[in-house]
Amino acid sequence: MNARRILLVILFSLSVGLLSVLGFWQLDRAEQKRERYENFLERHQSSELRLEKNSTLADLKWRKAVLRGSYEEINLLLDNRVYMKQSGYEVLTPFKLNDGNAVLVNRGWVSNRGSRDFVPSISIAPQILEIKGYFGPPPVVGIRLFGHEKFELTEKLGDSIIRIQKIDPSSLGYVSNGKSLLKEVFYLEGSQVGALKVDRKLPGSGSEKHEAYATQWFSMAAILAFIGLWNLLRKKAPDE
């Protein structure tokens, strides 16, 4: 076997090995996604928590809960949210618990009626009540700008309405009158007081995507291995 053929064998072997490693990596990612999804289902299907004060639980993510307290007067409009091909906002309102601390409640979607000058009517009369929903991460949207540590591109539309491009519960003290906020957002059920247009889809596992990628990598590895072996045997035949 001459040096050229040896080099080709090495290159084919390395390529097949690399493609196989990528395939196994995608399978590992799929397994991680499945485990994460199983954890989500377990938490989301567990019994409801009842919170009247800021919880000391380490992780409330995806837990269903009943909150007792009252809505604050201020409302946040999370910009550039589209529903049924219509532009609008997600409305987030601090909800004061009985101990004075607060939870940021995602009340759903509202239309801007095709104009950024339109200010929707979303206020709620302050009253003690109970609301149901579940905890989850804040909506992901917007681009972080240099020098903005709280809200990016904030815009006051009225005495109690602020339009924002990105949200971070850890920096909401000046919006919630200095009250501490849970790090998770509370997603309100559609039948509750204060709910707007609520049409949320809970996340799937996402493992199918990684399994499909793994199949692609393994298929490419198999095809490349076949081509390499076929060329090796074909060139070797005349020498025998």
What is the role of each PLM region?
Residues 1-54, 60-240:
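Surface-exposed, charge/polar-rich loops and edge strands
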